[in-house]
Each structure stands twice: as structure tokens, then as C-alpha cells.
């Protein structure tokens, strides 16, 4: 798989020894340009070898997805087709239990070398909600955390996260070293699009062209997804 950032000859031996893998989870109900733009910007800025979009099965802190897991997975696969360094990881959909991020991180970490860097990409709201996550204090044992910044964020982090940021924050995300253990912030292009908005438009019979990739729109139309009940 092609890396998101070209490396010069001086970096070749390091690139061979240490892989840089990012994961971006979500229900992707459906996947849209906001998800994809954030993923690509992070991958390119961080020079990741791979950024995996990881569809959630039954996320404990989210509403049940509107369409079946196989449809959401298929749409994500359509969305990243031909995009260098973006890929799909379906492991959470293969579990017959709630999707806990700590389990996923442990599973992925077991497949990597001890030197490989793993980056968990989170939106600001998700990051502020970390203290409600299962075994959240263990996350940084397995990965670095990259928090997507946006100018309209209006959620304040709880005290537990303020303390964690004071101890583990790195001002330059590209300077994070080691396989895991730090938190940093990455700017994202603000795009006012959401899966909820897209579902509402589709249910009302309106077009979502240019809000989702053409291949995803074709899949939605072919399978008659997100239509209002008759």
C-alpha cells in the first residue's frame, strides 16, 4: 500500500523499520466527504503508511446504525477505492459483542511490531467523552491519540482529560515518538456535513450528491437505503 507521504533516501531505513498506522472509527451511516477529508488530511499531514477506516458494529455510546453492517462496510470500501493509503478494517463488524475501542487497539497492536506507531484519530466531542469509554485509561498504552480540531468546538473537556493533557500532550503531532503514549491536535478543514443530515435529506427524497462520493451514492440508490417508510 502506498504511503501518504513520500520519504527521501535518508528516511528509507526508518520507514522500513517503523510503520505508522492510523485508525478512524465510526458508524459511517453513511460515510461522507467529511469523514474522508479528515482521514486524508491526517494521513498526509502525519505521513502515515496507512489510515484505516474502521466501521463500528454496535458502538456502546452511539445510537444503533440505521442500515445493516454489511451495507455500511460496502459503502466505506467503495469510498476508499483507489485512494492511496486509505483502507478499511472490518474487525469490529466480525465481533458478536459491543465494539470497545480498547479491544480493537489490543488486537491491532498484536499484529504490529513493538516499534510501530499506532494513532487513534478522534473528533473533539468523542475525545471529551473518553472518560465514559470502557477501560479508557489504558488507551495510551497502545496508541497515540490525534484529536481533530475544529473552530466551532463548544464542548469543554472534563477534569480527567485536563489532567491527562497536562501530562501527555505534545504540541507538534509530527514530533510524537515511540509506539504510543501521547496526545496531540491536528487541524481539519471544517466541512458542515453530517451523516444525520444526509439521512434526513435521503428520507425526504432530496439529493445528497457532492456530500458523499459518487460510488457511495450509487450504492445507496441501488440498494434503496435511507428511504422513508411507505
Curated annotation (Swiss-Prot):
<keyword id="KW-0547">Nucleotide-binding</keyword>
<comment type="similarity">
    <text>Belongs to the NadD family.</text>
</comment>
<dbReference type="Pfam" id="PF01467">
    <property type="entry name" value="CTP_transf_like"/>
</dbReference>
<keyword id="KW-0520">NAD</keyword>
<protein>
    <recommendedName>
        <fullName>Probable nicotinate-nucleotide adenylyltransferase</fullName>
        <ecNumber>2.7.7.18</ecNumber>
    </recommendedName>
</protein>
<comment type="function">
    <text>Catalyzes the reversible adenylation of nicotinate mononucleotide (NaMN) to nicotinic acid adenine dinucleotide (NaAD).</text>
</comment>
<dbReference type="InterPro" id="IPR004821">
    <property type="entry name" value="Cyt_trans-like"/>
</dbReference>
<keyword id="KW-0548">Nucleotidyltransferase</keyword>
<keyword id="KW-0662">Pyridine nucleotide biosynthesis</keyword>
<dbReference type="GO" id="GO:0009435">
    <property type="term" value="P:NAD biosynthetic process"/>
</dbReference>
<keyword id="KW-0808">Transferase</keyword>
<dbReference type="InterPro" id="IPR014729">
    <property type="entry name" value="Rossmann-like_a/b/a_fold"/>
</dbReference>
<dbReference type="InterPro" id="IPR005248">
    <property type="entry name" value="NadD/NMNAT"/>
</dbReference>
<dbReference type="GO" id="GO:0005524">
    <property type="term" value="F:ATP binding"/>
</dbReference>
<comment type="pathway">
    <text>Cofactor biosynthesis; NAD(+) biosynthesis; deamido-NAD(+) from nicotinate D-ribonucleotide: step 1/1.</text>
</comment>
<dbReference type="GO" id="GO:0004515">
    <property type="term" value="F:nicotinate-nucleotide adenylyltransferase activity"/>
</dbReference>
<keyword id="KW-0067">ATP-binding</keyword>
